[in-house]
Amino acid sequence: MFVSTGGIDFDKEKPSILLMHGSGLTHIVWSLHEQFYASQGFNVLSVDLPGHGNSEGPSLESIEKISNWVKSLINVLGIKKIIIIGHSQGSLIGIDFASRYPDLISSLVLVA
């Protein structure tokens, strides 16, 4: 799994933003956003979803499986609530995640 943090070390005491790209894309689409949010005091987690960019393994087969993968990621990092910003397929993942794990999400931003 590849995660970019906008150049700032992760601190689980700060609010966290997960930036999720669309199908066939990578974390690179969020490069400027990563730096901006990190400079504003947020933890930034800009992932390459499985099967994309620098992340190993095959693509996951469904939105639900990717949502479960996201849940595992935030559990491993000890994040209690997360802000998800999703683009295209990342928006679908955010919607599914928010509907199934409402206690783990503080905000959801959808980008066409």
Positions of the model-derived regions?
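Conserved hydrolase catalytic core segment
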Residues: 81-112
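Conserved HGGG/HGGXW glycine-rich cap/lid loop of the alpha/beta-hydrolase fold
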Residues: 5-56
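Conserved acidic catalytic loop of the alpha/beta-hydrolase fold
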Residues: 65-82
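Membrane-interface segments of envelope glycosyltransferases acting on lipid-linked substrates or membrane lipids
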Residues: 6, 23, 42-48, 68-71, ...
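Catalytic nucleophile-loop/oxyanion-hole region of alpha/beta-hydrolase
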Residues: 56-67
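Short, hydrophobic alpha-helix immediately C-terminal to the catalytic nucleophile
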Residues: 31, 71, 95-99
